[in-house]
Protein backbone atom coordinates (compact mmCIF):
# COMPACT_ATOMS: atom_id res chain seq x y z
CA UNK A 1 0.00 0.00 0.00
CA UNK A 2 1.45 3.35 -1.01
CA UNK A 3 1.79 6.01 1.66
CA UNK A 4 -0.25 8.46 -0.45
CA UNK A 5 -3.33 6.19 -0.34
CA UNK A 6 -3.50 6.35 3.47
CA UNK A 7 -6.01 8.48 5.40
CA UNK A 8 -4.52 9.57 8.75
CA UNK A 9 -6.84 10.55 11.62
CA UNK A 10 -6.67 11.24 15.35
CA UNK A 11 -8.74 9.25 17.81
CA UNK A 12 -9.18 7.95 21.36
CA UNK A 13 -9.05 4.30 22.45
CA UNK A 14 -12.54 3.31 23.62
CA UNK A 15 -12.19 -0.44 24.16
CA UNK A 16 -9.53 -3.15 24.19
CA UNK A 17 -10.26 -6.29 22.15
CA UNK A 18 -8.41 -9.64 22.00
CA UNK A 19 -5.27 -10.11 19.84
CA UNK A 20 -4.00 -6.52 20.26
CA UNK A 21 -7.06 -5.05 18.55
CA UNK A 22 -8.64 -1.84 19.79
CA UNK A 23 -11.86 0.06 19.22
CA UNK A 24 -10.99 3.68 18.40
CA UNK A 25 -13.37 6.64 18.31
CA UNK A 26 -12.11 9.07 15.68
CA UNK A 27 -12.29 12.85 15.96
CA UNK A 28 -15.24 12.91 13.54
CA UNK A 29 -17.28 10.52 15.74
CA UNK A 30 -16.85 7.29 13.76
CA UNK A 31 -15.74 4.15 15.63
CA UNK A 32 -13.22 1.84 13.90
CA UNK A 33 -11.38 -1.35 14.82
CA UNK A 34 -7.60 -0.93 14.73
CA UNK A 35 -4.49 -3.02 15.33
CA UNK A 36 -1.01 -1.93 16.40
CA UNK A 37 1.60 -1.31 13.69
CA UNK A 38 4.63 -3.58 13.56
CA UNK A 39 7.11 -0.99 14.85
CA UNK A 40 4.93 -0.24 17.88
CA UNK A 41 4.58 -3.97 18.59
CA UNK A 42 8.34 -4.50 18.20
CA UNK A 43 9.15 -1.67 20.62
CA UNK A 44 6.54 -2.85 23.19
CA UNK A 45 4.51 0.37 23.11
CA UNK A 46 1.66 -0.08 25.60
CA UNK A 47 -1.77 1.26 24.65
CA UNK A 48 -4.49 1.69 27.27
CA UNK A 49 -8.12 2.79 27.17
CA UNK A 50 -8.33 6.59 26.94
CA UNK A 51 -5.02 7.07 25.09
CA UNK A 52 -4.96 9.48 22.15
CA UNK A 53 -3.66 7.76 19.03
CA UNK A 54 -3.02 8.43 15.35
CA UNK A 55 -4.74 5.89 13.06
CA UNK A 56 -4.09 5.13 9.38
CA UNK A 57 -7.12 4.04 7.32
CA UNK A 58 -7.24 2.79 3.74
CA UNK A 59 -9.80 4.24 1.35
CA UNK A 60 -10.97 0.68 0.60
CA UNK A 61 -12.18 -0.26 4.11
CA UNK A 62 -12.88 2.66 6.44
CA UNK A 63 -13.98 0.41 9.33
CA UNK A 64 -10.47 -0.98 10.00
CA UNK A 65 -7.21 0.80 10.67
CA UNK A 66 -3.65 0.66 11.96
CA UNK A 67 -2.45 2.54 15.06
CA UNK A 68 0.84 4.24 14.17
CA UNK A 69 1.38 6.69 17.05
CA UNK A 70 0.36 7.06 20.71
CA UNK A 71 0.30 10.58 22.15
CA UNK A 72 1.61 11.06 25.66
Swiss-Prot record:
It is found in: Cytoplasm. Pfam families: eIF-1a. Residues 1-72 form the S1-like domain. Its main location: cytoplasm. SMART domains: S1 (SM00316). GO terms for molecular function: ribosome binding; rRNA binding; translation initiation factor activity. Keywords: Cytoplasm, Initiation factor, Protein biosynthesis, RNA-binding, rRNA-binding. PROSITE patterns: S1_IF1_TYPE. GO terms for cellular component: cytosol. SUPFAM superfamilies: Nucleic acid-binding proteins. Component of the 30S ribosomal translation pre-initiation complex which assembles on the 30S ribosome in the order IF-2 and IF-3, IF-1 and N-formylmethionyl-tRNA(fMet); mRNA recruitment can occur at any time during PIC assembly. PANTHER family: TRANSLATION INITIATION FACTOR IF-1, CHLOROPLASTIC. Belongs to the IF-1 family. NCBIfam families: infA (TIGR00008). One of the essential components for the initiation of protein synthesis. Stabilizes the binding of IF-2 and IF-3 on the 30S subunit to which N-formylmethionyl-tRNA(fMet) subsequently binds. Helps modulate mRNA selection, yielding the 30S pre-initiation complex (PIC). Upon addition of the 50S ribosomal subunit IF-1, IF-2 and IF-3 are released leaving the mature 70S translation initiation complex. This is Translation initiation factor IF-1. It comes from Marinobacter nauticus (strain ATCC 700491 / DSM 11845 / VT8) (Marinobacter aquaeolei).
